[in-house]
Amino acid sequence: MKKKKLIPCIIAIVAIVLLGIAGVKLYQLMFGGAVKVQTADIISAIAQMKLQLIIGAVILIAGIVILIIGLRKKDENLKDLLKVQGIVAMVLAVVITVNTVCFGPQYSNLSTVLSGTTAISEEHINESLEAAEAIADEGITLLKNEGNALPLASGTKLNVFGWSSVAPVYGGAGSGSSDSSKAASLLDGLHEAGFETNTELENFYTNFRSERPSISFFGVDFTIPEPTMEEFQNANIFENAKAFSDTALVVIGRSSGEGSDLAMNLSDDNNFTIGENGEHVTFSTQEDDLDAEKSYLELSNREIAMLDEVTKDFKDVIVVINSAQPMELGWLDQYDNIKGAIYCPSPGQVGFRSLGKILSGEVNPSGHLVDTFVYDLHAIPTINNFGSFHYTDYEDVTGSADNIVPFVNYNEGIYVGYKFYETAAEEGLIDYDEVVQYPFGYGLSYTSFDAEIADTQDDGQKITLTVNVKNTGDVAGKYVPQIYFNPPYTDGGIEKATANLIGYEKTELLEPGESEAVTFEIAYEDMASYDSNKIKSADGAYVLEAGDYQINLCSDSHHVLDTYTATVDTDRIYDDAHDGKRSSDEQTATNHLDYAKGNVTYLSRAGHFANYEESIAGPTDFTMPEEAKENYASVVTFDASKYDDADAQMPTTGANNGLKFQDMAGVDYDDEKWDSLLDQLTIDELKELAGNGTFHVVATSSINLPYIYETDGPTAVNSFFTGKFGTAFPAPIMVASTWSKELAGRFRTCIGNELCDFGFTGWYGPGMNIHRNAFSGRNFEYYSEDGYLSGCVAVAEIAAVRKLGIIPYMKHFVLNDSETDRARGICTWSTEQAIREIYLKPFEMAIKEADANGIMNSKNSIGSRWIGSNADVQNLSLIHISEPTRH
């Protein structure tokens, strides 16, 4: 009898366990350990399924109650009936809950999980691997080569120092990450190139620590693993290494990722919140590396001790910098025995093979820097206005001190990266050689080149330059002629930098003595500056001021090789009151973002940067401006009634016009047929299209729109939800470092083919934000500190995937140039000139030149106005760029 009573209880327990297993299996199916699910995600998912879970729980509890009641009944027939009903109720609870969840709130996610095919074709895999290696061949940058120490002789024995040699950085974390499980390691690359490495040293490092500390959504650990000198000495590492070889290769690595900016000091104190959820930051688990005077982008104390010993014991030392962020590298010139240095950021699946080939001389390096490398990162103009700052009086609006509003000031204005350093040197503010170690665009080669302007044609609207490049060295190589313009400047007038990249190309592989003619076309209007302060225009406009424009052929942003001077006789003001819009614009560009300026003091060239100290100082006023309080979008203060319009007319919905989405291919933007199609949408469909769009576009029956599958990311096909991962390409920063538009296009053609193989139509990329600060966590995922270079790479990439029918969602639009507080509606203050000339520039170029048809918004506010509902940013500031095109 007791056994009979146990059976229903066992069944009830089994039902509950099965429901739990179903949930776990669903989680594994959807995420497979690949996606980093946050607490907020779980809470959101539960909230979506609340109704279904409540119904299931009620039925399950009812079943359990019925079983318990049945156990107490003496009538056997009634007992059996209640047992059956209880079991049926519990089974129904499982079936109903799972089905209503799968076909209700989680339908879109499940559809995404089960989408497409599961494999990339062999042909496309091979094409991708070849392209990835070509990118690394041309993206790795030679920084130093004293006495032609490189390339190394074939068969050289190498002592490879630095813990990062056994755990190098292949890419970054987050949406821009990639699957490096099949990657060729750094040591693999050396071995394939014919080098023999010290296996004792390799084993020593591997035994010290096998995994790289995580910088990700779940935690931030800035530990820089490296053994102590005592551990080196106890293992007799240096003595044995000297017996193995007199040549040392030192690898210094730094990682980064989405959700976290990098530590500006390695102290015990968490001086600002880093990460999406404010996770605690571990600065180092190695106490002797904790140093409040040092940042994550400097050598750690243990690394210095290791380098001291290595440079003492080995006469030829080569350094590899494996970091997507510019590091402080002054020490490269402080050790006499460091003869060579190579910059190798995030090389991906096969990029370390390229490193081996460059070290051996099989490949001549032709990469160039996309950022300026300075000696002191704590002295850059943005350093005091990067991090977490909060207004102290938002509780006046919400009534609660728990509701905070973060903000950041883009205090440097247009003087970002090299534009500051080149201009500051010209104005006498800095001694360039004391501040800058490696200029923007810098890169050495194993050969030498001569470049000169051979011919110039100038019709007053366009300048055509012919540049002759000749290989004057002994080995074949590629060269990048760079064109910068230096515009006329009036003290106190429109802000202008002395160096502005406006053209670059990469030559073919030139044999010794071989020459190539490279042609550049420069439109005068592209040298216009945006007059957001309304100095020469009533409403703001692009202005090409009268005067001499120096068109400089350069090897990098600082070294001028040849110059052509173009003269503009009178101001050209591109507004309706003067000379009309620029020819590349669809409508005249005027100010729409005056409110974004706020109450910030911005860096100005006036008086030789007279306000430098004031403008670069950190915030001193943490009071939220009254206008900002009125406009700031917050769930705490949101009032839907503010959007009520008594005169609003309900649009037509649910019309039966007989149109299908497929009928609209090639239909002109202004064709009324679009209105007829949109009239067919129902209210429910409109809500679904607007509110249910993560990694997909929902199927919409009224217009026959199919379900569209979408995925990350900027570096590789990176589908967290489906577990579908493509080739791990070098990160976008290395793609940009090739300075090759052809390779950028080839890169995205390969990713586009992989997207098609997997069945994806939408692609969350490319990442086009700016390297405003070296400590930004996602610099690996973005191209450069320069808007024009970023735009050129983006144009090549977007044009390539558009040809394959892929929708590229260029991101993150706009001013998403750090990770700190990015998801908290951070108020971002900047001048409209800087926004247009630098941060919007890549987006503008992509729309104009590559017919870009997708944008992913950032989560911040421009000024105090949330970008998601900011019509000025979404429409008005872009509408001048190009005639809108529906796709």
Regions found by a protein language model. Name each.
Residues 1-552, 556-557, 580, 584-882, ...:
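Glycoside hydrolase catalytic-domain context in secreted enzymes
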